[in-house]
Amino acid sequence: MPSSSAMAVGALSSSLLVTCCLMVALCSPSIPLEKLAQAPEQPGQEKREHASRDSPGRVSELGRASRDEGSSARDWKSKGSRALSGREAWSKQKQAWAAQGGSAKAADWQVRPRGDTPQGEPPAAAQEAISLELVPTPELPEEYAYPDYRGKGCVDESGFVYAIGEKFAPGPSACPCLCTEEGPLCAQPECPRLHPRCIHVDNSQCCPQCKEKKNYCEFRGKTYQTLEEFVVSPCERCRCEANGEVLCTVSACPQTECVDPVYEPDQCCPICKNGPNCFAETAVIPAGREVKTDECTICHCTYEEGTWRIERQAMCTRHECRQM
């Protein structure tokens, strides 16, 4: 056993020696190639080592650069917002100037030419500033539509100016006025009253004038011409007057010749159907006749021929009579 192990060790060592020799023989001519292969790698390795050494500094520089860019972007944004707010304030100022009568100042700044970019604005804001900004001029209030001539003169409706102390009519339907330093002094004259039948009034003059009068009357739902007479009832007669009013009169009935007059539907005054008569107590006595009311009393109705005069009460006389 010891001899076999020794032999095995010797064989192993001899094989190892041979292997080493072969390796040395094979590797000896490749030394310059390895050097040449390692030569270009060394600068790259040095660069990597240099980059690894310089990387913290560069990272810090990049961090600072990014922070600077972020801060500069914020500065651009803040400056842009300030520029936008400045333009809004400027537009409000222009509107205020226009409302105060300084429309000329606002008109000078309505258009901003190209290239007039505010300093420090970001590119987006610069593009907005370079573009033409058309600002509409606000309309002036009504009180500024015409110049104020108070203390200098007076103006009529057509815009004509009159000097102080001059008489003029402010409008086509206005009365004459006197121009004073305090303004027009107008006095309304006393105008005549219009006709009650006037149906068309002309107000183009200082005093209104009647241009047309109605030539008819209206009465109880009917229309009548001027000066026309008409009968409303058997006892009423009416007339359309020139002033448009209707005047009516009631017929005056004469005294009846009887004590029992009768009214007929188509007649205004009563008539005596029984002729002239009078009363003897409750009895009716015809005129001119005697009537015996009882055995001892005779009554007659007084009547004068041609005059139709009668007494209401009959004349009665009582005679002596025999009692049966």
UniProtKB/Swiss-Prot annotation:
One of its GO terms (biological process) is positive regulation of cell-substrate adhesion. Its main location: secreted. Predominantly expressed in the brain (at protein level). It is expressed in the neurons but not the glial cells. SMART domains: VWC (SM00214). Residues 1-27 form the signal peptide. A motif (Mediates cell adhesion) lies at residues 114-116. Residues 152-211, 215-273 form the VWFC domain. Residues 92-107 have a biased composition (Low complexity). The keyword GTP-binding does not apply. Residues 44-56, 64-78 have a biased composition (Basic and acidic residues). Residues 37-126 are annotated as: Disordered. One of its GO terms (cellular component) is extrinsic component of postsynaptic membrane. It is found in: Secreted, Extracellular space, Extracellular matrix, Basement membrane; Synapse. The keyword Repeat applies. BMP antagonist which may play a role in neural development. Promotes cell adhesion. Peripherally associated with AMPAR complex. AMPAR complex consists of an inner core made of 4 pore-forming GluA/GRIA proteins (GRIA1, GRIA2, GRIA3 and GRIA4) and 4 major auxiliary subunits arranged in a twofold symmetry. One of the two pairs of distinct binding sites is occupied either by CNIH2, CNIH3 or CACNG2, CACNG3. The other harbors CACNG2, CACNG3, CACNG4, CACNG8 or GSG1L. This inner core of AMPAR complex is complemented by outer core constituents binding directly to the GluA/GRIA proteins at sites distinct from the interaction sites of the inner core constituents. This is Brorin.
